[in-house]
């Protein structure tokens, strides 16, 4: 059995789970999320725990088993705790500001770059070089953070750009003149 898939997911207090065929819906203090579990995988609630099972040991079913369990676990964690990704901006003149719910970046381009907050995503700015992306959906939070990082990827020669907090950038040595 899948080591990830066979672990049951404990349902914390204040969280409601509704299973309708392949659709799993989780309601908690921070909101409601749902996911469609792939077809051969079945999900059930037993003794206050969510159990994900597969019909047989076929290769695709084994891989979908762990995936489905992780997706359902992400829902439970999202509606109880939420997800936050912290980011840092490095570079002279590079800064970020909060404009209403949206972010405005100055990244050395001839124009400011505006990132709109999609539904369920909130931004927080600390100073003008640190920001955090928060929400209950792990996939949405990660996608928005990746879009922000792609605005100005880290430069390995000068170390300028946007990076995740704690991310180490391998620095390269530039050309040496004669």
UniProtKB/Swiss-Prot annotation:
GO terms for molecular function: rRNA binding; structural constituent of ribosome. Keywords: Ribonucleoprotein, Ribosomal protein, RNA-binding, rRNA-binding. One of its GO terms (cellular component) is cytosolic large ribosomal subunit. Signal peptide: none annotated. InterPro entries: Ribosomal_uL6-like, Ribosomal_uL6-like_a/b-dom_sf, Ribosomal_uL6_a/b-dom, Ribosomal_uL6_bac-type. This protein binds to the 23S rRNA, and is important in its secondary structure. It is located near the subunit interface in the base of the L7/L12 stalk, and near the tRNA binding site of the peptidyltransferase center. Part of the 50S ribosomal subunit. This is Large ribosomal subunit protein uL6.
